[in-house]
């Protein structure tokens, strides 16, 4: 937002520069945490390794009920990396002097496209092109001309759903606290910061669980048809 101080804004106030800088910072933090967690692996984990193992076990447990144990572990690298990246991007809205890249539609749209392309790729790879797209037509052949375009629109709408949900919530929280700071810059904004912290966790979780849900719908066609 224009007029708000950011550390990167000292270098340049160009909006694109600020967005890209904060995005790379979120990516760098993700890499640093991953590096610290795997630097000295121990049988009995301590420190950052302990936190990371707990996080990864939580991600697998989250995916287990959606897609099964084996697939939850298979897609763990994608979902866990997205989770860390999005979380650090969201967290920047809480820290003064930083601007959350997830409050930019370009960021969230890019992530949504990654998920969309990947789950369709996995669905085609697992089931074959014909079988995968035949599933869009539904079980009743007579209704296939109606169901196929509806399913196509439904899948494309997932891009909008994923991207605008994350963007809207983070941007909305940002604007909400900004208004509170303008009205009363001391005690009043504190509940707003608590809300932003909760939202950072919640929106990360929602994006991760939906990624697992979309992957399950793409690769488990055989189970759905039973």
Swiss-Prot record:
One of its GO terms (biological process) is proton motive force-driven plasma membrane ATP synthesis. GO terms for molecular function: proton-transporting ATP synthase activity, rotational mechanism. Signal peptide: none annotated. It is a multi-pass membrane protein. The chain crosses the membrane at residues 17-37, 78-98, 104-124, 175-195, 201-221. InterPro entries: ATP_syn_F0_a_bact/chloroplast, ATP_synth_F0_asu, ATP_synth_F0_asu_AS, F0_ATP_A_sf. F-type ATPases have 2 components, CF(1) - the catalytic core - and CF(0) - the membrane proton channel. CF(1) has five subunits: alpha(3), beta(3), gamma(1), delta(1), epsilon(1). CF(0) has three main subunits: a(1), b(2) and c(9-12). The alpha and beta chains form an alternating ring which encloses part of the gamma chain. CF(1) is attached to CF(0) by a central stalk formed by the gamma and epsilon chains, while a peripheral stalk is formed by the delta and b chains. PANTHER family: ATP SYNTHASE SUBUNIT A, CHLOROPLASTIC (PTHR42823:SF3). This is ATP synthase subunit a.
